[in-house]
Structures are given as C-alpha cells and as structure tokens.
C-alpha cells in the first residue's frame, strides 16, 4: 500500500469517529505533518509513513517545534 493510500484509509476511520481531517497540502512550512485532526476542542497532528519510510531531519524539527507548543503529534507507520 502506498503512503498516500495508507493515510487516506486511516483518515476515513478517524472521520467515521467524528474527527475533522485537514490535509496539509499547501503549507509554506516544509516538513509540516501530513494531517491535522480536530474534534471537541481537541487537536492533533499526524505524519504518515510507509513500512520503510522514515522522518527527515526537517520533519523531526517541525514535530519538535509543534510539540514544544503542547500539541500532540503522532507518527503513524503502516503495519
């Protein structure tokens, strides 16, 4: 399964549970996580990776930057 297909599958499941899924496609910040999820005043970010995928140094930096602002960032690997 491609990383994109895995991301879509996961997002459909989240949407079925009431989460609003926002795909970050036109961001001016490179390395920003793939999606943002919102529900009942809760927010988290998700970066999706294929089985062999790994985070770039810039992605690690952005994730740490977001976490330093007390937001949750999940890194979700395909099983």
Identify the residue ranges that each predicted region occupies:
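Catalytic phosphate/metal-binding cores of nucleic-acid and nucleotide-processing enzymes, i.e., regions
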Residues: 1-79
